[in-house]
């Protein structure tokens, strides 16, 4: 039996605002945007060059969901965006106004820097070291 993780849900306040940020600012690809009901869409995005796990943008539909926006992991890093060009992506994201909350650092596992998306979620931008 073979399994893989297809998508991870990310609760957002507005579909179009989220698409604009993740695709416009971070350069992700919009994989699918299908209207299911007048209030609900199936919106999948994925980092450019990736054919792996997608992010399902899930628009908050009640107060409990709205309270979780930007804090789905209780303040911990939620998503780890791996790149093969850390310096290039860091510069591009900085130029695009991404909110980096620390300076890049080298760890045993690679080069990493934490940022917050426009909704407050913590991400790591990461380039793995060749030895790991």
Model-flagged regions — what are they?
Residues 1-7, 29-82, 88-116, 126-132:
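Vicinal oxygen chelate
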Residues 14-15, 84-86:
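Helix N-cap motif at beta-to-alpha junctions
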